[in-house]
Amino acid sequence: MNYTPNLLAQGLRTSRTYTIGLTVPGIDNPFFATLASTVIENLKLAGYHTLLADSLENQKDFESSLQMFRSRSVDGIIAVPVGNPSEITDAITGSIPTVLIDRYYENTNLPYICTDNYVGGYMATEYLIGRGYRNILSIQGVEDSTPSMERVRGFKDAIAAHSDKKIEYAIVGDAFSVENGYDQVKRIFSEGEAFDSVFAYSSTILLGAIRAFRELGIKVPEQVGIISFDNNGFLDFLDPAITRIEQPLSEIGRLASQALIDVIENKPQDIPPVQRLIAPTLIVRDS
């Protein structure tokens, strides 16, 4: 039989809408598109629809997304937070259950499921050092976001652990964008800086860097090595295929969805909120 559940009738019985609000800071970014897709699929399997909003990496748009979700009476929210924690924590911690993904705020009770970016930053830097690179350009994303801050911390700690090797480095950049990667590489390498490797904090930054290197006539990996964060499949189809730190997006989507649904479906409130960091994986290719 072709049975279609009546969500309105179910909602009247349970005071639920079976709808979850999901906000990400750039659905045109392949990373956030993939992350959103995994969340939506897991919520669908659990019987929930998803209302998707794009904050465009802007705090006011993020706050507007939260307001819109409340006006639509969503049962819960999964959010990549954007903005100053002291200004938006109250906006997040309302009466609607909320789980953060990709980014989190320390010293709060907000649940989160995120990549362990410190481990990833350390791992990427250890790999470059192990390959013999001694002058590393680190191109970060949004400077005050936890992914960037934790990757920088891991990057610096890995270098400090090899102080005997006298590694030189610079940390530049301010966005998880193609333009950021392109502009930083074009400017720095045009000035004759002697970096022998690049750590790109996202696949979008990487693409910009690759474009700049080609315009400058600098060969990868013959003249400069590259490692990138993110697990977009197209990185294997670049020439050369890109060595990367792969994030566990499927697991993040599954665990975040389950954590939120557990709260919605009357999980005891005295249980501490789920706050979990998941280790990424080093995928070695040709770059």
Question: What is the role of each PLM region?
Answer:
Residues L22, S73-P81, L137-Q140, I171-V172, ...:
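Periplasmic-binding protein-like
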Residues K166-I167, K186-R187, E191-S287:
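Flexible loop/turn connectors
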Residues V24-T34, L52-D61, R103, I113-M123, ...:
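Hinge/beta->alpha junction and helix N-cap segments in small-molecule ligand-binding domains
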Residues T38-N42, A91, E150-H162, R187, ...:
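Alpha-helical structural signal in soluble globular domains
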Residues T17, A36, Y133, V152, ...:
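ATP/adenylate-binding site constellation spanning eukaryotic-like Ser/Thr protein kinases
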Residues L7, S15-E126, G130, F189-S190, ...:
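Alpha-helical recognition/docking segments in bacterial nutrient-uptake
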Residues M1, A46, G94-I96, H162, ...:
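Helix C-cap/helix->beta junction micro-motif
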